[in-house]
Amino acid sequence: MAAVRGLRVSVKAEAPAGPALGLPSPEVESGLERGEPEPMEVEEGELEIVPVRRSLKELLPDTSRRYENKAGSFITGIDVTSKEAIEKKEQRAKRFHFRAEVNLAQRNVALDRDMMKKAIPKVRLETIYICGVDEMSTQDIFSYFKEYPPAHIEWLDDTSCNVVWLDEMTATRALINMSSLPAQDKMRSRDASEDKSSEKNKKDKQEDSSDDDETEEGEVEDENSSDVELDTLSQVEEESLLRNDLRPANKLAKGNRLFMRFATKDDKKELGAARRSQYYMKYGNPNYGGMKGILSNSWKRRYHSRRIQRDVIKKRALIGDDVGLTSYKHRHSGLVNVPEEPIEEEEEEEEEEEDQDMDADDRVVVEYHEELPGLKQPRERSLSRRSSASSSDSDEMDYDLELKMISTPSPKKSMKMTMYADEVESQLKSIRNPMRADSISTSNIKNRIGNKLPPEKFADVRHLLDEKRQHSCPRPAVSSTKPDIRQRLGKRPYSPEKAFSSNQVVRREPSSDVHSRLGVPRQDVKGLYSDTRERKSGGLWTRLGSTPKTKEKNTKKVDHRASGAEEDDSELQRAWGALIKEKEESRQKKSRLDSLPSLQIEVSRESSSGSEAES
């Protein structure tokens, strides 16, 4: 195997002049003199240090957004501030005997740009930095520099921006002619200007008093060429420019006092400036439908998603129904059958996450290239306070990729090749799902009603009646958990049978008597209703039984009849006749019960308790 050579790259912020110009450093020269091995002679496993001397800020991408001037920019073309251009202008004026009025706003200034670049290493001579533009829009700034139309504007924040021209000469003229010295430097420059004006007046008087020969028309004296006066910058003003001080503007803009200077490479927009913008909170953000106030990141995401869906519909309308989209092969593949026209938009940055925010300045309305001209005009009229501009490539979101992901089917949703086992499994799942639903429903019903206890065996009623007739102990029930009905329903408070066992079963009586159904023996009706007042309601009392007062009367009457029976044999015979009749009736009832089928009664505690709770 070939030997692998490791590399170690070190990035340093500052670089000396030698390596930047491509010259060998003294360390490298000393190493070559000592005879160190060349890179091809490095042994296996050793590391070779390769220094890369570049500034870290140069590696960062440029996220600034440019707002183009639709009215068109102005280019001077030639350096009118150079000494040669000024001399030619003065010679032309003297040749045609023309003396222009002094215009302080349009001065011909000779500025040494090489000296400016040495004094300010990161200066951008084609760009002017302006601050104090709090209530100004992009169009307001373009109209402010209408004498020197700029190419575009780079917004930094609500109060400052960079105005960019296509050449350095126009930017220099705009800075010098549209601004003045600071207030501190004006006092210093006054004395120098007075001395200069006095010297100029003396020279003019000397020229008028001289009796030299007149020159022919179109000729210029060689001696006067050396006496041409150039409107050079004063020493104070030149020092102020070299320090790159803020110069106050000559005129106000919408009541704002502007200050300007040459821009540098450090004048860049900070991340999140659009989110902190008070201008958007007051006047609305055009990139989000003119919404005013604080816009949350979730609201921005929803706005982006709605806009993407709208763009997808527009793209499909451009593509046509007959042109089909190819299959989605890869997530990061390019668009297919979609116009390669970028949709200008800004990126969003999460405050807690490391996503890019709508960082670029949104003071203008973003245009859609698919819009018709008839639709663009009312949009521009309604939102004319911010002019539209094109953004840089680094500031645009990858909308083409998002359109591709939305308009084409996802690989998860696409049909795949399946086997018979997969079909069987899907059928089993479809069968199991309703079974699970049924089991869940039955479990819920059981929880509501309660689990059903195992069925219990009950004794036959006929056997119970036989045992009662023979005065024998009744057979106990199979389950001890089921109590007697009388025990659950309660015993009559005034029942004559005090010592009746709870386990005994009642003898079946006619259904007309309620007390006989509850286990109370039937009493003689004739003896109970001897009173005429009681006989009126005898039909009801035969069913319900006698009251406690009637019971006391009955007992007294029975005692009285017993004592009377000893005296009167007729009464005794009547009593025996009644007993015989009662036995016969009981036998008849027994025969009737024997002919009836077996009857079983099942009453659970839970059902009775549930019925009581419902009542």
From Swiss-Prot:
Which keywords describe this protein according to UniProt? Antiviral defense, Cytoplasm, Isopeptide bond, mRNA capping, mRNA processing, mRNA transport, Nucleus, Phosphoprotein, RNA-binding, Transport, Ubl conjugation
Look up the signal peptide feature and give its range: none
Query: Where is this protein found?
Result: Nucleus; Cytoplasm
Q: Where is the composition biased (Basic and acidic residues)?
A: 185-208, 361-383, 506-516, 549-564, 580-593
Q: Name one GO cellular component term.
A: nuclear speck
Residues recorded with modification Phosphothreonine: T408
Q: Where is this region: RNA recognition motif (RRM) domain?
A: 126-187
- Region annotated Disordered sits at 15-43, 182-233, 332-400, 430-454, 467-615
Q: Phosphoserine: which positions carry it?
A: S25, S73, S209, S210, S410, S563, S615
- The biased composition feature labelled Low complexity covers 15-27, 606-615
Record motif WLDD motif, residues: 155-158
Q: Name one GO biological process term.
A: regulatory ncRNA-mediated post-transcriptional gene silencing
Cross-link (Glycyl lysine isopeptide (Lys-Gly) (interchain with G-Cter in SUMO2)) at residue(s): K12, K70, K186, K536
> What role does it play?
Associates with NCBP1/CBP80 to form an alternative cap-binding complex (CBC) which plays a key role in mRNA export. NCBP3 serves as adapter protein linking the capped RNAs (m7GpppG-capped RNA) to NCBP1/CBP80. Unlike the conventional CBC with NCBP2 which binds both small nuclear RNA (snRNA) and messenger (mRNA) and is involved in their export from the nucleus, the alternative CBC with NCBP3 does not bind snRNA and associates only with mRNA thereby playing a role in only mRNA export.
State the oligomer form and interacting partners.
Component of an alternative cap-binding complex (CBC) composed of NCBP1/CBP80 and NCBP3. Interacts with SRRT, KPNA3, THOC5 and EIF4A3.
PANTHER family listed in its UniProt record: NUCLEAR CAP-BINDING PROTEIN SUBUNIT 3
Spell out the family assignment given in the record's similarity comment: Belongs to the NCBP3 family.
Q: What is this protein called?
A: Nuclear cap-binding protein subunit 3
Q: Which organism is it from?
A: Mus musculus
